[in-house]
Amino acid sequence: MIDSAAMKAELLRAIYAWDRLRFALWRRRFGARLEVGAAVSPNLRFTDLRVESGARFVVGPGYATERRRGNHVWVQSGGALALGPRVWLRTECGPNYVTVAEGARIELGARCLINGAMLHANIGIRMGDDSMIGFGSRVLDSDFHHLDIRTPERSSPVTIGERVWIASDVTVLQGVTIGDDVVIGARAVVTRDVPSGVLALGHPARPVRSLGPRARLPE
């Protein structure tokens, strides 16, 4: 009698071994520009990845993503993208777009979740541990263009604290600091700093109520 469970387990082991081999070969293309920690999902190789000369992409241990081509990452010359332990670039709701301009830096803390969002840094974006960005949201540290002949393009780093939840279709603009334990409601536009421990809503986003600590939320 054929042991179907054993056959399935053997097939899964073979698929996993093949994935690891292909992942190792894929990593070699980037050399020292790509640094990968332990227990990183081999699905990383499905990333549409460009890491230019002099740039670095550091992937912390336990990185996760799905087995699809939903992540688009471009680290330009002299730029750096650093993902902390157990970061999840989730693609089930849509693609993620992460762009690091020349000399800029994006840093995501431990256990951050990016779910179908866009991050673009001309100078820098930093997210603290256990923070999340929802589907269709954007974090931009620059205007990208001159407003007029008298108003040049402006860039200023963005800082997002720990245990922050940025909901769907939110825009976070340059120079903003968001404190710890904050929730930014859907479709908000964040143009100014948000203090810790609040729910912020609207255009522009303003605190509407205080929140308790988010450190002990259920899994």
Language-model features: where?
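A mid-sequence, solvent-exposed acidic-amphipathic segment
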Residues: L147-R150, W165-A167
